[in-house]
Amino acid sequence: MSFTNATFSQVLDDLSARFILNLPAEEQSSVERLCFQIEQAHWFYEDFIRAQNDQLPSLGLRVFSAKLFAHCPLLWKWSKVHEEAFDDFLRYKTRIPVRGAIMLDMSMQQCVLVKGWKASSGWGFPKGKIDKDESDVDCAIREVYEETGFDCSSRINPNEFIDMTIRGQNVRLYIIPGISLDTRFESRTRKEISKIEWHNLMDLPTFKKNKPQTMKNKFYMVIPFLAPLKKWIKKRNIANNTTKEKNISVDVDADASSQLLSLLKSSTAPSDLATPQPSTFPQPPVESHSSFDIKQKILHLLNEGNEPKSPIQLPPVSNLPLNPPIQSSNSRLSHDNNSFDPFAYLGLDPKNPSASFPRVVSQNNMLTNKPVLNNHFQQSMYSNLLKDQNSVQHLFAASDMPSPMELPSPSTVYHQVFYPPTSTSVSSYGLGKTPQPAYGSSSPYVNGHQTQQISSLPPFQSQTQFLARNSDNSGQSYNSEGDSNSKRLLSMLSQQDTTPSSSTLSKEANVQLANLFLTPNSLETKKFSDNSQGEEISDNLHGESCNNPNANSVHSAQLLQALLHPSATETKEETPKKTSDSLSLLTLLKSGLPTPANDLQNKSQNNERKASSQVKELEVKNYSKSTDLLKKTLRIPRNDEPLEAANQFDLLKVSPQQKSEVPPKRNELSQSKLKNRKKKENSETNKNHVDMSPGFVKILKRSPLADQKKEDTQESDFKGSDDHFLSYLQSVVSSNSNGLH
């Protein structure tokens, strides 16, 4: 039928008869199935009828379906709701599964894409909706053939596909690799596919990172499948590489085995070798190789690297001389112990060197019956060896240095070791002590450093004591005139084992004088509440009674006899007898009566009271009971330091709160030294001597005025040590007598 002059109403009648009136009854009852038929009628109208009649209008599917619903009597019942029916059809159409294929080339770098008929259509893989009761693979084959004209039934793999759901519609595309680039594609449908082309996967959007997204809208139907396609290609390439390696190894082995079999089976040489051209020159005869020789060569080549190595055979040494000649010009080499034996050096038996080697039974040995070296060569070899040895020995013989043979054994060499003294070793120094040896008389002789005697005091304490002793000695300046009494007094103080001398002083007077002076309670319990008393005590030190340079030192000697020998005293106090000058001295000191020199003493007292400022308090501590401490306490300054001597014996009151604040200013004696002295003196003293321990006086100096200092120095220039000593004793006795009263 020709539609060249047909009207639009005639065209609708023809389309209704073709696609709707002849449908089965069950499809006519379903709006969805009727809509599919209306879509087929629309395609026929656009593809064929309008091609014959250009005057017919081009309509869309929605408008075309509305006109057909109104024109066909079977569709009148849905004419009023045809809009709703068409919307239901579109929703149903998007839920129909779609099947297609992705066709790749041999390198899997390009794929086949198709473009719709309209200009606004984009690129996509060939695919289509599945029909009723149609399988997925059959639908994919059919759609690929309709859109591209390529039959992929023999290449499709049902297990290789990409399945996705886009907007509620399931899409499955089967991957078909290995399509040739020379394949000709042509669509089998009318006005559905406009282009079919190969596209490089690297040029597609989202397939490669960091690539500008150009023309993305044209590939919107391809983009969702690119990521899974890239993963599939990667896995496929890895699998192909492994299979290729296996195939290559198998092919190589097969070729090698086939060549080997061909060589073994051939009875002659290979026939493919080029035969020589005939020439006029005479040719050498060519030896014919049998098949056995070829096989032997092949086996030899195959087993060339696996042959066991034959053991190395040593040359026979049975022909060597048993006793090689020894030529020695040195007398030292003639000795058995010093001679050089090459066989012993090599670990061989000198008498039978050949017996030292293991005997190996060898066959086909051509050298067993022949000598390895002739006798002349052996003679020269041994002579050269001995010449070298003799040259070394000759060097030792020519020099004065002994040879290694003449050196003594290490056991006879003695090394003398010197141990230098250490920096921490200090020799102790004590009064009246002699240094003791490091070892006793029974100790063996040791050739080395002997340990020096180390002081029992701590390093800092012994050093302090040593500095104090040096400072005391350096501060003393002795005068040559009128100093005999002072020297005598110091010599008597330094003696420890002084025997009592016969004197006119009675024992009772010595006892009372020693008790008055040495009793610590008299010094500790004395309270000086009045300042005038303290001034009076200090003034007594500068009295005129001490100004006589010609005073007799007998009193000092007798007094020291009583002080140094307290064991001769008695506990009972008796009234002193006035039998000698010392008794009168004791009575005078005890009574505190004025002496003929009281006038000068009163003058000095007045001057001292005018010049005295503030009196500092002292701390009196009892440290030890030894007489040596008393000697250190009673040290009287010389004529060059009168003011210091006067200030040292100012006994003042010390409050309990200030005892902790007053720091000691004199160098304290070490406790260990005092203990040693105490042990020696306890053996000599009496048991009653326990309470007779002197106190150690800690003194704070006071500074008089400058003008008064000059006057005191002028007055004390002619004072002797005995005068100072007697003045000090007088002040102590007077203070004790006042305290007792």
Curated annotation (Swiss-Prot):
Its cofactor is Mn(2+). Keywords: ATP-binding, Cytoplasm, Hydrolase, Manganese, Metal-binding, mRNA processing, Nucleotide-binding, RNA-binding. One of its GO terms (biological process) is mRNA methylguanosine-cap decapping. Residues 94-227 form the Nudix hydrolase domain. One of its GO terms (molecular function) is 5'-(N(7)-methyl 5'-triphosphoguanosine)-[mRNA] diphosphatase activity. Its main location: cytoplasm. Changing R18A: Abolishes interaction with dcp1. SMART domains: DCP2. It is found in: Cytoplasm, P-body. A motif (Nudix box) lies at residues 128-149. Changing E192A: Abolishes the decapping activity in vitro. Residues 606-616, 681-690, 707-721 have a biased composition (Basic and acidic residues). Residues 1-243 are annotated as: Interaction with pdc1. GO terms for cellular component: cytoplasm; cytoplasmic stress granule; cytosol; nucleus; P-body; RNA decapping complex. This is mRNA decapping complex subunit 2. The lineage of its organism: Eukaryota, Fungi, Dikarya, Ascomycota, Taphrinomycotina. The gene is dcp2.
